[in-house]
C-alpha cells in the first residue's frame, strides 16, 4: 500500500497519491488507497529510448485518471509530462524529449466513478451474470 502525502496550508489542504515510474500501470496501487485528491506520477522515461514505450507509459496514466476520477499530474524526465483531467483529457502537456513546464491552476471534481468505488469486483459480477445467463438459456432451450 502506497502512503498518501498530505500537504496542509492555512486555507489549503491536498492529499497526493505518489506513483513512481511504472507503478502507474497497476490499478491496484490506486484502489488500495482511495482517499486522495490527485495522482502524482514521477518517471524517468529515458531508458525507453526512441521506442513507443514513453507513449504507452503516458497512456496508462490517462487510464488511471479515468478509473479513479482524479487528476493525474505527470512529470517525466525525457518523457511526456502532462496534466490529465478526471475525464482523460490532456489539459496541458510537454512532449517527449522537450523541456518545459505546465502550470496547474484549478481543478474540477467529478463524482466518484463506479470503478473507483468497486474496482475489479465489477468484472467478477459481470462474469457471474454471464454464467447465470448461460444456465438460463440452457434451461429455456431444454424446456
Describe every region a protein language model picked out.
Residues 1-143:
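Solvent-exposed soluble domains appended to multi-pass membrane proteins
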Amino acid at each position: 500500500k502506497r502512503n498518501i502525502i498530505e500537504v496542509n496550508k492555512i486555507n489549503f489542504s491536498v492529499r497526493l497519491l505518489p506513483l513512481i515510474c511504472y507503478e502507474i500501470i497497476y490499478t491496484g496501487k490506486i484502489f488500495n488507497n482511495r482517499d486522495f485528491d490527485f495522482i502524482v506520477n514521477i518517471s524517468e522515461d529515458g531508458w525507453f529510448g526512441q521506442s513507443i514505450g514513453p507513449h504507452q507509459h503516458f497512456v496508462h496514466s490517462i487510464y488511471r485518471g479515468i478509473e479513479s476520477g482524479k487528476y493525474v499530474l505527470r512529470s517525466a524526465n525525457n518523457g511526456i509530462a502532462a496534466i490529465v483531467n478526471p475525464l482523460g483529457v490532456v489539459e496541458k502537456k510537454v512532449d517527449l524529449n522537450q523541456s518545459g513546464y505546465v502550470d496547474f491552476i484549478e481543478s474540477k471534481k467529478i463524482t466518484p466513478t463506479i470503478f473507483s468505488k468497486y474496482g475489479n469486483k465489477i468484472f467478477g459480477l459481470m462474469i457471474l451474470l454471464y454464467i447465470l445467463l448461460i444456465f438460463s438459456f440452457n434451461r429455456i432451450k431444454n424446456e
